[in-house]
């Protein structure tokens, strides 16, 4: 299913128009909370919001590229820079969502033990590790891409593919023999593993909610916050990573499904700020998960 270029353009522009201000608000809200008390959830939220902000900044260029049917509109050296700026947040977001979910689950399942060891410095270390893993993986994939001009009558280097007498294409014409294994490894390590962690933690938070003493309204809100990360992974990042797996198994499925997956991935910049819960400015409006202990109900 090929989306019309005008529709792809409109979807990218809409994601930018909504996601850019939402993530600015999320950063502002998280910073205001951090001034009162810095917590691991705030650290993950700040990194996620900054990651989404970087992704949102690349969306206007992606929209222009879609309107031009994939033709790269900038000078060729900007292609690898764009690749890192666009795809690093796309993959890193799953790691930050999994880290947020793990923190909520540990706070619910082991409230007092987790309270004793939860330190923002540990969360900063996790975030640095996620960024390093993503950037090294992407950098290695781009660096190993070899020029194939003598083989397939094209000029290819660092993500740019230029058919002879044709227009430059960034990444989307990447040699399939290199692209499919690389994209599959990205998806397994940076999406499906975080997805499993997030799903496990979501079930743990739901079990804690069942035994909590909160009102029905607050239980619903807590369930939404706990399930928001899983929802974002499935709805926004799921289609793109599923297309990577499908195209590895059956190369005929590549192309239009990948383009659709990139569009849904772009909309994660809209959904993430809504589910992390830091758009408000008042204290205590952030992400929560609850549990009942012998000393009362604890919120995370």
Swiss-Prot record:
Keywords: Cell membrane, Disulfide bond, G-protein coupled receptor, Glycoprotein, Lipid-binding, Membrane, Receptor, Transducer, Transmembrane, Transmembrane helix. Residues 32-41, 102-121, 201-223, 280-300 are cytoplasmic. Expressed abundantly in pancreatic beta cells. Gene3D superfamilies: Rhodopsin 7-helix transmembrane proteins. The keyword Chaperone does not apply. The chain crosses the membrane at residues 9-31, 42-64, 80-101, 122-142, 179-200, 224-248, 257-279. Disulfide bonds join 79-170. This is Free fatty acid receptor 1. Glycans are attached at residue 153. One of its GO terms (molecular function) is bioactive lipid receptor activity. Belongs to the G-protein coupled receptor 1 family. Its main location: membrane. One of its GO terms (cellular component) is plasma membrane.
